[in-house]
Amino acid sequence: MTADSLFQHSPEKPPAWLLGQLELLVRRRASGRAGHALIVTSDDIEEASLFCHLLASQEFCAGVPDASACGQCANCRAFSQGVHGDFFVIRRSEGKVFIGIDQIRQATQALQQTPLYGSIKVVLIEAADQMTLPAANSLLKMLEEPPGNSLLLLTTAAIWHLPPTVRSRCQRLSLSPPTAEQAQHWLQAGRGMDAEAARRALQLSDGKAISAFTLEREGSLSMLQALVQSFDQADLSLGPPAIWSKVSVPYLLEGLLLWVESRSRGTVQDGHAVDANWLRLHLCLGELSDRVKRGATPAQDILVAEVYRLYRNCGHKSFERTCSRFLASLGEVNLSG
């Protein structure tokens, strides 16, 4: 589920923890104190995308200016149905590793045309850190010479992966995460999940409320739960758990990273040595994940075997040396990204 479809469920009701920042931004834009380009950052990339959809809906709404769109005017109806002609979403195409230059060029051409519904056009680039360098360079032209009355929104959970030239030409907004109570309440009262399902979804998504709901709606919770259970039981198996080869490499690494973070926070045995090894494992997995996100294409069977070997050796005293050798050899398994 993307933020497009999530938004359609209740476009007029922003989550409570986002409302303050949304209201402030709406006032800044109404007073002319906000620029034409904004980077929205959040650890929960789905939250950043939803926030941008909420902002765009307010920009298009023909009702009374407010942080919440009226939901009744022609603009609001078109937007909530996903058919608004002045709203363009750019995201990585299915089967692709990056957002390409052609996608950015298409958005630029669309912005140069006269708005169909009102006076503004909005482009949203989801997970903008996934742009290729040529795509980012093409985006610079749009940032330096914005066509007409337009608003460019970028979302990211890794702003440091965006080129400095892009970051310097955009205003930034870092979203505040919900408290545990806010996240639980939103999933139950706002999305109709029962208490146990909401608790489990938040636990599996590391407390990210919007991603938790997305996982539940996509039916991915059971797969993620099986993956987490495989991490708990991997040290008892004779080889990599079968499920590790059934999920995508990015999904496997992201899930394992979250699990290692949780495990390292809860470690109480053998004090600092064990804690340090969990941190070293996290470093190795994080480097793997970053390289895959940057376009590395390792053979899944080799990567799974290497990750399993790291995991099994995490408790050894020589693990620091193992990690050093692993990081030094990444290029040998097509992970030079």
Question: What residue ranges belong to the model's regions?
Answer:
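Short loop/turn elements that form and flank the Walker-type P-loop nucleotide-binding site
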Residues: 33-34, 80-84, 116-119, 146-149
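Flexible beta-alpha connector loops of hexameric P-loop NTPases
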Residues: 94-101, 128, 172-173
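Conserved alpha-helical scaffold flanking the Walker A/P-loop in AAA+ ATPase domains
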Residues: 23-29, 98-122, 130, 134-142
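Charged, glycine-rich active-site and insertion segments that engage polyanionic ligands
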Residues: 1-61, 66, 75-78, 148-150, ...
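Conserved Walker B
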Residues: 127-131, 159
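Conserved catalytic/switch belt of AAA+ P-loop NTPases
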Residues: 137-154
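AAA+/P-loop NTPase substrate/partner-engagement loops
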Residues: 69-99, 160
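Structural motif
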Residues: 122-124, 153
